[in-house]
Every structure is written in C-alpha cells, then in structure tokens.
Amino acid sequence: MSNPALQVYGGDEINAIVIDPGSFVTNIGYSGTDCPQSIMPSSYGNVETDGDTKRIFNEQPLLFPRAGMEIKPIVENSTIVDWDRAQEQWEYALNTDLKFESNKGTPVLLTEPIWNSEASRKKSLEILLESMEFEACYLAANSSAVSFAMGRPTCLVVDIGHDVSTVSPVIDGMTLSKSSTRNYVAGKYLNHLIAKNLKPREIVPIFQVLKKKPDFVKRTLSFDVNESVINFANERQFFQEFKETLLHIAPKSLSSFKDELATQTKRSLEAPWGEELIFDADTRYSFAEQLFRPVKEDFPEGWPASTDGIVKTWHNDYVPLKRTKPGTSTNTKEKENTAESTPVPASTEQEAVDSPSQEPNENGKRPVENKEDSSNNEQNSNEIKNEDANSNESSAKATVPSNGIQAKGEDEVAGIVDLINKSMMEADVDLRATLAHNVVLTGGTSKIPGLSDRIMHELNKSLPALKFRMLSSGHLRERQYQGWLGGSILASLGTFHQLWVGREEYEEVGPERLLKDRFR
C-alpha cells in the first residue's frame, strides 16, 4: 500500500492515523472511520525461553499461559510507562492489523491525558516524528477528543475508565487543565472490591479449569504460571463479566434506599470454576456505591488515594499577552519565550527594577505585592469593625467553603460527584450553566446501569441553581473508544490540517518550543 506524500496541510484528502492509548485497551485506526481497526490490551506478554525474548501484544494469546511468560503494563493511569514497548505495539498494529507499509507521508494524531508530563509529551514527539518517521503529528487531550465525538465543543467530560476517573471542562474544544479533577476510583478499584468480597475463595482463571461439573478439577501445568498472567486473565474475563452482569447503582444514596433494596431479588453468576455465586441487592449495589462515596479503609496498600482530586499539570491555562515597549522594534520573533517578550510599560519599568520580587514566575503570573506601608492603616481599620460581625463572618467561613459546596473531611476521598462539583466551581461563573447543560459521560466503567441517573440526582441536590443534562453514547461499546472516535473526526476535518506539526518544524524549533507554542 502506497501512501501519498503530505504536501499541503490544508487539503482534505489526507489519511491520518489515530492512536488512543488507554489504561485498559489501546485503539489504533484510520481517521474518518467510525471504529478503530486495531484494539489491543495496554499490556504485553514478555516470554523468555533459552535466552530468547518474544513479545506478545494480541489479547487472545495473552490469555493462554506459556512457560516463562510475564505480562507487563504499557499504560498505567492513562500515562505511557514503557515507551519502547509502546512503539513496538504501535508498529505491530500498523503492520498487522492496518496493513500499513510505510509511515512516510502520513500524519498521526495521539491522544493524551490532560495531566501528561512535559517529559512524556517530549517523548511522544520523539517517538512519532523521529523513531516512527511520521510526516506530521498532533497531540490532543482525551477530553477534547470526546467532546468532538459527542458534537459538543463546550461540555463537561466525565470519564470513568479502568485506572482513573477524570472530570474536565472543555470550552470550544480546548480542555481547561486548571479546572480538571480526578481520582483513582474506577474499574480497577471495583475489581479489588469484588476480589475482597469473594475471599477466601480462590479466583481461578479459565485456562486453569480442567473440569467444573460435576466436581471442579483444576488443570495441572508442567510449568509455573506467573502471577501477572493469572491476574490478567481474571481481569479480562471474570471481573469484566461480573461488573457487566451484577453491578448496579442506586438512584439515591444506599442509606435512603434500604426499603427499595428489600424488594430486589437476588442475582447469580456462574464462576469459571463451576460455583454459582449468589448476591443479594445490598451487596451488588454496595460495590458501585464507592464510585460516589469511596471508603479510604478499603483501599489496598500503596493505592494512590488522592483526597483533593486536583490534577497537577506542568502547563498553565493562563497565557500572558505579548506587548512591545515604546520605542523598541516590533519584531519579537527572536524574543519569544523570554522575559522580554512580555515587557512592562515604560512608566513602571524603574519600579520593576527596584522590586525584583515582581518578576513573573514560570507560570507567567506575578506574586502578590507586600505593602508594608499600608498594612498599619488596614490593621487600624480592621480594629474599628464590629466584633460581632467579625465573629459571625468567621463562623460562616468555617462551615461553608467559598464554592458553596459542603466540604469533605481531610481523610475523605472525593467521589465522582465531588469531582464534578469541584470542577464546576473552578470554572468561570459565566460558563457553569453551559457546562451543566452538557455533561458528557464516557469511559468503560460508565456502562454500569443507573450511573447517569444517580449523577443527575446528586448534582441536582448539591447545585440546585443549575440545570443539568447528561449526555452519553447510546452504544455502550463506543464509550470504550470514544476518545479515539473524536480523534478520528478531528483529524479528518479539512480545517484541522493546518494544525499538524511537521517533522521539519520539529527539527527546526525543537520539542520545548513546540510544546509551549503549539500544544499548550
């Protein structure tokens, strides 16, 4: 298959590749199509026999144990942790599933989480443009891609995936990093809760079952099976079926839903080892309830239990305007990304020299000015104020946070609705009504029945002044690759092709300049 050279970025006849690496699966395919041509697990099998190393990327071979095989992750918490294997997996998918002969002349769009580090983004550009020799590339935020897939350029994306749950406001297709929130209560955590409930039972994967009726007989293998292979098989088979079959979310908190639970019937699931697992309604509803009210004591040792839900990002949404000093040259091309690119007015230039603490920091913001001369006056005026008014004001501040939402304790982990509330309050007040009217629910774990109605109920109770509307894809399977679908739509737009970053531009200005000027 020959690939036409990428000569004009404004043309419409450009076949781009879209890569969407997630925590559970990695989706790869052509732009302009409605589903990815390659869906592979975000893990690989490393088989070492007699000094030789073989790597397996397809899911079905990974479910069959081999001597000396260990399964290792490529993506964790939506971030690529093994770049060498990621490149090898992408090349395998392009050659095997997409029948791609050469990357030259073809652009590629890569989705990434909003909290992706600067080092990881530099590595992305290096792999795509240098190692894999794509003609051009673009890095798109997952939440921005989801907004394009739903046709909502301004929305609030609630992504409940395998490792991470994320809430991100998207304004005109751009994700606001400083208003994004996340926690680590998602599908993987539900797997842990299910396994904890089933103890002391041993969860036996299908490949270890020789016979399950009338009596269970475990298969004996001639080699030792690595623990990672057993965990991978259970995660892809038993836990997935369990969550899709038995889990349900109550329309309101379980404490106020007890009477309705008493009328619910029990449900059962046949385990791979032949046992019929029977669960009452209270147990089935309690698993997914932790998406809303996580219990910190249930977290396994070493689990990243963030209590604030704040996303730490290396970049800033705030971009200072570039102004020119009076009497200086208007050509600021050579001074971009320097202190001179945002000069102060001539009247205050001497003041800036006298006050070195007023220099902009790395985020482009200036520190708060410390005025010692005016502090005495302010102190005197504060003493004159009525003491009763001060006491009332201080008590009000102690009980009600500034955003108007009931504060959680220091040791309480934020649930999904807490993340939405925090993200909404961090956004501009003029945008909140639009965001509330376009709440997009996506991610593999969002397929649990009752999730959308419960989020709507909790939001109407916590923020009654706003009118909320939940949006989600009617195809449940599509929610697992909705980020890829948005990237496919984005890369196929004729007006988007001017945003491609070519290899020549990368070699000319370098990755640091590109990340600051083109991929903020």
Swiss-Prot record:
Ranges where the record places region Disordered: 320-406
Record's compositionally biased regions (Basic and acidic residues): 362-374
Subcellular location: Nucleus
One Pfam family in the UniProt entry: Actin
Main location per the UniProt record: nucleus
Highest taxon above the source species: Eukaryota
GO (cellular component) term, any one: nucleus
Compositional bias ranges of the Polar residues kind: 339-361, 389-405
Listed Gene3D superfamilies: 3.30.420.40, Actin, Chain A, domain 4 (3.90.640.10)
This protein's UniProt keywords: Activator, Chromatin regulator, DNA damage, DNA repair, Nucleus, Transcription, Transcription regulation
Similarity comment text for this entry: Belongs to the actin family. ARP4 subfamily.
Function text: Chromatin interaction component of the NuA4 histone acetyltransferase complex which is involved in transcriptional activation of selected genes principally by acetylation of nucleosomal histone H4 and H2A. The NuA4 complex is also involved in DNA repair. Is required for NuA4 complex integrity. Component of the SWR1 complex which mediates the ATP-dependent exchange of histone H2A for the H2A variant HZT1 leading to transcriptional regulation of selected genes by chromatin remodeling. Component of the INO80 complex which remodels chromatin by shifting nucleosomes and is involved in DNA repair.
Subunit structure: Component of the NuA4 histone acetyltransferase complex, of the INO80 chromatin remodeling complex, and of the SWR1 chromatin remodeling complex.
UniProt name for this protein: Actin-related protein 4
Origin species: Kluyveromyces lactis (strain ATCC 8585 / CBS 2359 / DSM 70799 / NBRC 1267 / NRRL Y-1140 / WM37) (Yeast)
Lineage of producing organism: Eukaryota, Fungi, Dikarya, Ascomycota, Saccharomycotina
